[in-house]
Amino acid sequence: MSSLNIAVLSGGISHEREVSLRSGRRVADALTARGHNVTIIDPDAHLFVTLKNLNPDVVWPALHGSSGEDGAVLDLLHAAGYNYVGPSASAARLAWSKPEAKTLVSRAGVRTAPSITVAREAFRELGAGSVLELIASELGNHVVVKPASGGSAQGVSIVTKAEDLPRAMVDAFTYHDVALIEKFIPGTEVAVTVTDGASGATALPAVEIVPLDGVYSFEARYNAGETTFFVPARVSDEIAAKISAAAVTAHDTLGLSQLSRIDLIVDEAGEPWFLEANALPGLTETSSAPLAIEASGVDLGQLYEALARAAAN
């Protein structure tokens, strides 16, 4: 087959810029090794002039955070007529909104933790005391607080004491105007990469995530040695099948395509609970998706090439 002219978008201006640069470099290296002509572009005000001059067969958006995973750049790529690897902009927006994604996936039959959303304005105008009291009465004191949108665990806190909740809310509001507060579900965290093929969506082996300090934070995600991964996850075949089914259901329900990552918690009874979906999953050297791809017996570059060719056609 002939080689492709591929533009990899990485970097950008979000809080996850450095992660995006690392993902983009790994994707570019894998595709270059397969014989393709790859250009890495750090999106700026001249992005579409650069793309017009390059005239790529396909664009690979290795973007994370706002303007990448929120569908904004995907919308513009589609409007400009470029083929790209990834979901539709509308699907990316659904996955980007954690509360909306939770609602849809729950309706599709996958467990989700009880939760409350709180806007920054409401937190200020109604008084922090009354809002915090409501959260405690509805969800208890052991909760997870996170921005309603965002990735890489930025602004995410696990709270076990009522006095720690105000600080966690402020941290979440640093990254978004709305905070999502969920009841803490004890269990094992797994990440499931889902790929699309001729026969539909397929879940790759689940990656079990065991951070050294017990919290899968930004540092634990991207600093080598901070987290131990088990691939496949250390669960029975029966539970593994449940995990795969939940991940595929979430992927399909949100309209994701080609490559996604679904994060789940497996409780003590072996039941998976949906945490969030990632429309443009991280592909760095410490990300779970490449681990899952390799564990499935597929060469990383071969899969990336297949995704690029499918998008180009």
Where are the language model's segments positioned?
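Short, flexible, mixed-charge acidic loops at enzyme active sites
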Residues: A72-H78, Y216-N223, A279
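Hydrophobic beta-strand scaffold residues
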Residues: V38, N83-Y84, T112, V143, ...
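Phosphate-binding site of ATP-dependent enzymes
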Residues: T160-A245, E271-W273
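ATP-dependent carboxylate activation and anion-phosphoryl transfer catalytic cores
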Residues: G109, S236-N313
